[in-house]
Amino acid sequence: MSRVCQVTGKRPAVGNNRSHAMNATKRRFLPNLHTHRFWVESEKRFVTLRLTAKGMRIIDKKGIDAVLADIRARGEKI
């Protein structure tokens, strides 16, 4: 499974670790992903999404039905 939020589209970013001597080594900044199951009343079923903490806040604000409509409009299968 890829490390991509299904709501926000956030992906891993690449940057540097910096030591005290300012030596740079490559590293990845991973998104704060969680697998979360939501009850969708309109479909009478659970939907499992892999999303970040910010994605959960967006669902709290807009509602699961609106977010699912956005995801399906992008062509993702849920």
Swiss-Prot record:
Gene Ontology cellular-component annotations: cytosolic large ribosomal subunit
InterPro entries xrefs: Ribosomal_bL28, Ribosomal_bL28/bL31-like_sf, Ribosomal_bL28_bact-type, Ribosomal_bL28_sf
UniProt KW Ribosomal protein keyword: yes
Signal peptide range in chain numbering: none
Pfam families given in the database record: Ribosomal_L28
One GO term of the biological process aspect: translation
GO terms for MF: structural constituent of ribosome
Domain of life: Bacteria
UniProt entry tagged with the keyword Ribonucleoprotein: yes
Keywords: Ribonucleoprotein, Ribosomal protein
Similarity-based family: Belongs to the bacterial ribosomal protein bL28 family.
NCBIfam families from the UniProt entry: L28
Protein name: Large ribosomal subunit protein bL28
Biological source species: Pasteurella multocida (strain Pm70)
